[in-house]
């Protein structure tokens, strides 16, 4: 009987691990303007963060220099470069829903605004990122796709 219980516990634990997909890795945004690397914020934390690691257009056409956070409401931060900028932070795994992270924020350098955000890994290569003000119902979702360093962002089609 004890063996049977151990077997059920081991298989049950293995199944719960299999249901948790890894969010860590490189993601391209829906508009393909950027690649974001998502990983743990620190080794001691379960929180995840995202950093801008590639831009389709890294040079500001007005200045001829690397793009900066020029729309940030904090004037002291307007000179920081977009490459290397943390734009996702504070996400914790949802205890009730596997592959879902809540409690975080997303920063939009295109608007200079920070929004509440939740993230759902719908399959190993698809991430639903929902930014909102107040409650998720009043938000907007984007679908991000897992990518590689070598995969190019599509040219601007606007």
Regions from the PLM with identified roles:
Residues 133-158:
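Edge beta-strand at a domain terminus
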Residues 24, 30-32, 36-116, 149, ...:
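Central antiparallel beta-sheet cores of small beta-barrel/beta-sandwich binding domains
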Residues 117-121, 133-135:
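Exposed beta-sheet edge/beta-hairpin loop segments within beta-rich domains
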Residues 123-125:
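Residue-level recognition of beta-strand termini and adjacent short loop/turns
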Residues 3-14:
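Sec-dependent N-terminal signal peptides
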Residues 128-132:
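C-terminal charged interaction modules
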Residues 17-26, 153-155:
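N-terminal helix-cap/turn-to-beta initiation motif at the start of protein domains
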């Amino acid at each position: 009987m004890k063996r049977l219980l151990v077997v059920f516990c081991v298989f049950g634990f293995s199944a719960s691990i299999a249901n948790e997909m890894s969010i860590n890795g490189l993601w391209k945004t829906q508009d393909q303007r950027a690649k974001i690397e998502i990983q743990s914020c620190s080794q001691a934390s379960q929180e995840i963060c995202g950093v801008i690691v590639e831009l389709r257009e890294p040079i500001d056409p007005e200045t001829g220099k690397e793009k900066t956070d020029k729309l940030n409401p904090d004037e002291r931060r307007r000179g920081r470069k977009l490459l290397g900028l943390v734009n996702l932070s504070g996400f914790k795994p949802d205890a009730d829903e596997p592959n879902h992270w809540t409690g975080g924020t997303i920063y939009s350098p295109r608007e200079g605004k920070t929004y509440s955000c939740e993230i759902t890994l719908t399959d190993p290569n698809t991430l639903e990122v929902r930014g909102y003000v107040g409650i998720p119902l009043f938000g907007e979702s984007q679908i991000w796709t897992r990518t590689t360093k070598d995969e190019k962002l599509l040219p601007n089609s606007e």
